[in-house]
């Protein structure tokens, strides 16, 4: 059985997005833009900026020491 909030909350969000947001958003957006001003994203022309040397680190960024073993099966 599904709980009441699991049904009611998505329906209320859909009603808000479909019917209320088009009227409320134009009223609220000037205040929000004053609180959180957008800053321009500056693009750099440096081609080496995105490249990182991964020597000595595994894929999740943690340093590796010696061989790592990955087992997919349980050992009894």
UniProtKB/Swiss-Prot annotation:
Keywords, ordered alphabetically: Endoplasmic reticulum, Lipid droplet
Main location: endoplasmic reticulum
GO cellular component, as recorded: endoplasmic reticulum; lipid droplet
Pfam families registered for this protein in UniProt: DUF4512
InterPro entries reported in the protein's UniProt record: UPF0729_C18orf32-like
GO terms under biological process: positive regulation of canonical NF-kappaB signal transduction
UniProt-annotated stretches for the region Disordered: 46-76
Subcellular location: Endoplasmic reticulum; Lipid droplet
Entry annotated with the keyword Cytoplasm: no
Keyword Endoplasmic reticulum: yes
Post-translation changes: Undergoes ER-associated degradation (ERAD).
Region (Necessary for its localzation to the endoplasmic reticulum and lipid droplets): 1-37
General function of this protein: May activate the NF-kappa-B signaling pathway.
Disease (UniProt): Glycosylphosphatidylinositol biosynthesis defect 25: An autosomal recessive disorder with onset in early infancy and characterized by global developmental delay with almost no milestone achievement, brain anomalies, hypotonia, and contractures. Death may occur in early childhood.
Family membership noted in the UniProt record: Belongs to the UPF0729 family.
Assembly with partners or alone: Interacts with DERL1 and AMFR.
Protein name from the UniProt record: UPF0729 protein C18orf32
UniProt source species: Homo sapiens (Human)
Gene transcribed to yield this protein: C18orf32
């Amino acid at each position: 059985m599904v709980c009441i909030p699991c049904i009611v909350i998505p329906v209320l969000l859909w009603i808000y997005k479909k019917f209320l947001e088009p009227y409320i958003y134009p009223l609220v957006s000037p205040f929000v833009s004053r609180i959180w001003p957008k800053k321009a994203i500056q693009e750099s022309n440096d081609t080496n900026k995105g490249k990182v040397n991964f020597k000595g680190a595994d894929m999740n960024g943690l340093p590796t020491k010696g061989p790592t073993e990955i087992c997919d099966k349980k050992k009894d």
